[in-house]
Amino acid sequence: MTFIEEFIYKGYLHQCTDLDQLTAITQEVKIAAYIGFDCTATSLHIGSLMQIMILRLLQKHGHTPIVIIGGGTSKIGDPSGKEVTRKALTQEDIKRNTAGIKKSLSKFIKFGKDQGDAIILDNAEWLDSLNYLDFLRDFGRHFSVNRMLTMDSVKLRLERSHHLSFLELNYMLLQAYDFYYLSKHYNCILQLGGSDQWGNIVIGADLIRRISGKEVFGMTTPLLTTASGAKMGKTAAGAVWLNEDLLSPYDYYQYWRNCEDADVIRFAKLYSELDIIELNKFEHLVSEDINAAKKQLAYELTKLCHGERLAKLALETAVRIFEQGDIDENLHTFILAPEILQAGISAYKLFYNVNLARSKSEARKIIRGKGAKINDQLVEDENMTIDTNFLLDKKVIKLSVGKKRHILVKV
């Protein structure tokens, strides 16, 4: 398959400015294409995973992926998809977050100076030195405020009478300038992003045509949710981070292992590099095969993110916990102050304190519903006192909620 054919097959395509022409160009020559990431956290999470897999796909087909870290634009904040103004980031925040995002990306993409290697740039390199008056004179006249106000990211805020600062309105101008800069200095002809970026991408492509007469393209990916409608990248316990200092490889594995049955085939196409033969097997699964497919999916995706060794360790840990009933120290661990167990703590409070319940009342409800276990024994009394007598040989207490949520409490 060509790049565009595989792009469509895997389910990445939502919109394209001129798909036929872009298809023809990518079949004739190798192109440079870019995706931007703002520095809003110290790691990317799986909400960005589709964009990362697209960068890998570009590299696979011999095209040059360009990654833009938004060290400059993060000082403003993208209003796309947001109903409120984002909190401003300090220079220290941006520096710390940039390092973490580079770590996330380096798990998946080969950066370097050889042909086909990905390029990583920080748009602060050119945005920080922009002269405002020169920018207004040379570029401001090419932007239509009328058109900007029709963009979904702006229109949503205005329709709901939510505050939209002039600073945020400038975000799309700077993103358009990013595209222009990359087109001029790196011969980049394609910008990719989520569906909420369509307006910003089109404005950038239009700016390039007006100034240089060059034809460039934009493509967006669909907004992804799980089969039940939950937003990708978020769980009740928090974000599904790519960096292991924020989420263990085991917990990453378990997220994919516990995905909904209806999502298995789609996730395999979107996020794995299984070949077509393997993917076709996924499409013809019968109900009794679904758990085996989930294990394979979880293993493949964990291997992509954390490497083969840690993926195997996560798989082995899951087998011991769920299929053999052993306690494994690679399970997620919560450190409890020794004096708490020495004094004793009610069972429902312990489940709440280690984040297995969102509130004390929920913890009580779980126990009353026969959904809580301590050291694999059902908890009958929500008020029973848990103390040092519950510590096992490894000086841990195993807490479980249902069949899939487990934690080791250490003192």
Swiss-Prot record:
SUPFAM superfamilies attached to this UniProt entry: Alpha-L RNA-binding motif, Nucleotidylyl transferase
Binding site for ATP: 234
Principal location class: cytoplasm
A GO MF label: tyrosine-tRNA ligase activity
Record keywords: Aminoacyl-tRNA synthetase, ATP-binding, Cytoplasm, Ligase, Nucleotide-binding, Protein biosynthesis, RNA-binding
GO biological-process terms attached to the record: tyrosyl-tRNA aminoacylation
Domain S4 RNA-binding: 345-411
InterPro entries the UniProt entry points to: aa-tRNA-synth_Ic, Rossmann-like_a/b/a_fold, S4_RNA-bd_sf, Tyr-tRNA-ligase, Tyr-tRNA-ligase_bac-type, Tyr-tRNA-ligase_bac_1
Primary enzyme class: ligase
A cellular component term, taken from the record's GO annotations: cytosol
PROSITE patterns, per the entry: S4
Sequence motif: 'KMSKS' region, positions: 231-235
Compartments, record wording: Cytoplasm
Protein residues bound to L-tyrosine: 34, 171, 175
Pfam families recorded: tRNA-synt_1b
Chain ranges for the short sequence motif 'HIGH' region as given in the UniProt record: 39-48
Enzyme Commission number(s): 6.1.1.1
Family: Belongs to the class-I aminoacyl-tRNA synthetase family. TyrS type 1 subfamily.
PANTHER family, sorted: TYROSINE--TRNA LIGASE, MITOCHONDRIAL, TYROSYL-TRNA SYNTHETASE
Assembly notes: Homodimer.
Protein name as annotated: Tyrosine--tRNA ligase
Gene from which this protein is expressed: tyrS
